[in-house]
Amino acid sequence: MIDEELQQWFSHTEMLIAELLEDGTNDEVYHTIEHHFASSDFDLLEKAAIAAFKLGLEIEEPEEAELENGDKVFAFDIATEQMLDVNLIKKETQAMFELAKQCGVDYDGWGTYFEE
């Protein structure tokens, strides 16, 4: 059985890819996919980044941000290059979601850029 939160990320994936294609992004080129990870605990986030690095994933520099309520949160992205294939990105999303869960940090979805 698929986790309810993961199912929401799958729905997000389907919607985002459909919107990108509708807007005319080039579906014949690779897109940079940025998977977002966050935690209020920097040590946990750092351990997640190290775990991802050991898996051979491209880790972007961690950043500190302030939430609307004033709380601080730390975040980093894992960047991949993928075609806009729903099944492929769902599989990647599931792997990222599970990595976040194993490391005790939040998976905050993914984003990409419009490609000409």
Curated annotation (Swiss-Prot):
It is found in: Cytoplasm. Its main location: cytoplasm. GO terms for cellular component: cytoplasm. It comes from the Bacteria. GO terms for molecular function: endoribonuclease inhibitor activity; enzyme binding. Pfam families: RraB (PF06877). SUPFAM superfamilies: Hypothetical protein VC0424. Belongs to the RraB family. HAMAP family: RraB (MF_01888). Interacts with the C-terminal region of Rne. Globally modulates RNA abundance by binding to RNase E (Rne) and regulating its endonucleolytic activity. Can modulate Rne action in a substrate-dependent manner by altering the composition of the degradosome. This is Regulator of ribonuclease activity B. It comes from Colwellia psychrerythraea (strain 34H / ATCC BAA-681). The gene is rraB.
